[in-house]
Amino acid sequence: MRPVELLIPASSLEVLKIAVIYGADAVYIGGEVFGLRAKAKNFSMEDMAEGIQFAHEHGVKVYVTANILAHNGDLEGVREYFTQLKEIKPDALIISDPGIYTIAKEICPEIERHISTQANNTNYGTYQFWWNQGAKRVVTARELSLNEIAEIRKNIPDEMEIETFVHGAMCISYSGRCLLSLSLIHIS
């Protein structure tokens, strides 16, 4: 069995440092753009650079979210953003949009790419697809049971990593899915 990685979200440089000092194996952060935590404080590029350096000095990894579902107008800015991130060397990018994924693979292929839970990863076929695209890790959809996650594990390459939330927010509404009926009567 693989060791579990304790991955902690950090909303600021101060929180990142506390997570590192208190034993996180990895921390994920969002920048001022291209992440879904629009109301969070998030990190400036300077704070990201300082946080990544601090974490690396303590043997802790840092993953940066770029998990928006992009519109056409976002793509040029994403290119600039990844060019800047390449310089400060995060350990991975957490992405949900295939277009953004393609840009990350082109601009910073040396940085691992993880697929966000926002990509609704609910089956092993999806995991195999992302593995074939070069993703090292896929974050499960939060709605999956342990049995469903175990079935995914059995049907993907051993080298591929699965990440899952142990605790956190779960949206009750999602276009095309009725999570209430899924929970109550197992039909979406």
List each model region and its residues:
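Short, well-ordered coil/turn segments that N-cap beta-strands
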Residues: R2-V4, A24-D25, H56-V62, P90-D91, ...
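N-terminal basic/disordered segments at the start of proteins
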Residues: R2-Y28, E32
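Hydrophobic faces of well-ordered beta-strands that scaffold small-molecule active sites
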Residues: L6-P9, V27-I29, V62-A66, L93-I95, ...
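Conserved small/polar residues in nucleotide/adenosyl-binding loops
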Residues: I185-I187
